[in-house]
Amino acid sequence: MKILYVTKALIAPPYAGCMQRTVHIARQLKPCGQVTMLAINRRFDSDSVNVCRQEFSRFDQILLRSYTDFPKRRGELLRKFHMHWPTLCGIRADRQGQALFETLAAQHDVIWFHTLGAAQPFSLPRTTPMVMDLDDLNHCKYEQSARIQTTLRFRLSAHVQSYKWKRLEREALKRYAAVVVCSEQDKQLLGGDDKIFVVPNGFTLPAEKPTCGPPDPLRLGFISHLAYGPNRDGLIWFRDRIWPLIRREKPNMCLRIVGRIPSDNDLIRAEGFEYLGYIDDPTEEIQRWSAMIVPIPYGGGTRIKILDAFSKCCPVVATSIGAYGIQGEHGRHFLLADEPQKFADYCLMLSSQPERGCQLADEAWALFCEKYTWDKIGRSIIAAAETVAKTPSTDVTGKP
């Protein structure tokens, strides 16, 4: 089988969850046969290109125009239009890019798109079976965002965006031979159709189980790419509503923040917040945390940061949305709180009772090994690809 894997999220370094999902799904597809990666974006970094060329037998790129390539006023109008009208979500490939895509599509048995944004720039073929990995359900993200907006304008905008994305996501069920989502909950939100495959996010299984503790009782941690809205808004909520409650009880508590920081303007500042930047292997750092916090107020898919904590035997305190899609139990695998005082209490408890944190971490490790290693998830990925490869070409609509 020959699989064309199309993505806008490259993989070096994998500082965002979508990048980790991209590389691991593409790797898990290799047992099916030859995998060609087609990357589309407005810019490429040399590290990502070099890694992809080493990872895959064939790697191609299509460079899309950027909004800044247009005259200033037109570029701004296009950006706003594409943001508010996801049906036309972005800039189309030029003739050369479309021709390359058509050539590759004709040479492969299955096309696997990572998100609707990877398919949008092209006119799609009518004869090659296609898989759409929705990753996040954007309609859920906007629906949840509407609940926390403080102005009528932003609430209405979020509701409208949610409606538009819901239509697009449901239309994907008609346009693609299979649709992939991150959780059983997401599958049911789309109607539970047999052509929907659940491929959860995962994490790499360490060579051996990490040691749990002893943590630093005055150290909490957060893994975040702050350019991503749910991460940024979640950290602001934590800073404003929860951090003062924690520091009132333990004035020397610090929050260690790991993740790429696009610019100083993206820093969310507070006394005790320590930014470490991107760390290629944060295992030793995470093992010193008394807990990893996941104060996410809205979003879709599943939180790779929680699975990262599970794989490193670090206890987790999260909001219910922060733990969405993960088949864990409150009080057994993690602690969940949507109310600021309760969230703060859980953080303080784990700081003072490391043995309780180790109990949570041990149960979370067992759950991770059972359900969330990429070796286990790979079975669902291969099943989706093999099922789609058998789809008669007449079942593929090819609508753009």
Model-identified regions with their sequence ranges:
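Acceptor-binding helix/loop patch of EC 2.4 sugar-transfer enzymes
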Residues: 8, 66-89, 130-170, 225, ...
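Short hydrophobic beta-strand element within catalytic cores of glycosyltransferases
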Residues: 305-308, 315-319
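Conserved acidic donor-binding segment of nucleotide-sugar-dependent glycosyltransferases
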Residues: 334-341, 349-354
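Acidic donor-binding loop of glycosyltransferase active sites
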Residues: 177, 287-301, 312-315
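A short, well-ordered alpha-helix in the C-terminal region of glycosyltransferases
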Residues: 349, 356-371, 380
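N-terminal subdomain of nucleotide-sugar transferases
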Residues: 1-61, 106
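Conserved catalytic-core segment of nucleotide-activated headgroup transferases in glycan assembly
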Residues: 165, 198-288
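Donor nucleotide-sugar binding/catalytic pocket of nucleotide-sugar-dependent glycosyltransferases
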Residues: 131-132, 139, 159-166, 170-208
